[in-house]
Amino acid sequence: DVISKSIKKEGEVIGIGSFLYQQGRLTWALKVYKKGRQITRNPYAFANEVANIHLQLGEFAQATEEYLKLYYANPQNYSAANLSILNMVGPPSQNEIEQALLRAVDKRPSDRGLRNMVFEFYVLAENFMEAFVQVKSIDRLFKQEGERVYNFAETMRNNKEYALSNKAYDYIINRHKNSPFFFQAHFQKAINNELKAFDQVPVDKASVEAAVDAYKELLNTFGRKPEYYDPVYRMSRLMVFYLFDLDNALEELENLTASRQGLPQDRWAEARLLIGDIQLMQQDFNKSKLTYTEVSDIYRDRQLGALAKYKLSELAYYKGEFNLAQALLGAIKDNTSNDISNDAIKLNLTIMDNTGLDSTTTALEMFANAQLLTYQRDYEASLSLLDSLAYKFPSHPLADEILWEKATIYLNQNEIERALSFI
């Protein structure tokens, strides 16, 4: 009654309500603003002030409803209302906010802003399955051709939720065959499996196989064309270095590089270097050397040329041609990438440290040969040679490198405990 008699104008509401709020008289302040709504005949008036009072009282559902009134009053207030709601999200408030939002959507099922708020709430609350349900509804209701679902899939990848990310990509693949996101959904699904494989130590072979299968499905669907270089190359790398499926990878890459038409030069050279790696694994040293040299000559002063030179130096090192290896390493320019430069320095130091002590290079030749066998995935032969090396040269400076090479081999074979015993 006191409030009803004392407040007659809209202008008085803010002044009195604000004063009571600052004095901590929250219940009285709430009554003032409700009286103000009666005076203005506007159910959305003073929504921000009322929401803040409910928030202070721990009444999160009512606070959510009031912030929503900001949006109802003017859709341009969407961002402010949504941010205010999301800022409340936490263990004490989560359930109340969720229920308030769902009640709002139930009353206004076609309101895109509300749908987005619910979706963003679930993402922030890390209730990703419910977020997926909401984003699919948004896609269907507002005919978004999979765009929002695609963005959700990327968010799930960033959260390392690879299985749910793939579900989102599958949704696009199954429902949006004419969407601009159709090809990318196939491609990114394969990349997800690849990322999942490398999230584990050692690399998860089943995930690698799943990635290769996904790349094959993509290429069988869209064709093996120059514009689909990325999936062919990524698939081939997995086949070479993790599945050791050399023949099929070589066939894919040779078909890809048979004609340079439509394929950027850098991509062609990158694929040729991988072909050289396969030839080295197949012990076809002459072909490997020719392939690396081809790229080195064409890209003499560029990063790919430096990488080709480094691979040529590695090949010489594996064959025990240490002087040639050092000459090739010396030809690598200082402006190459850090990775190539660091690898070149490391290899050069290995040669220098193990050829300058005496006239014999037998130990280094054996070690280089063992590393080649490891590269070729002939682990048993490599371990046998490393054991012989350690026996013949028990106090050699290569002792630590021998242990590290053994650890690498056992790690590649998923024998983690055994690998750790050599570190």
PLM region descriptions:
Residues 1-423:
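Acidic, polar-rich low-complexity tracts and alpha-helical solenoid repeat scaffolds
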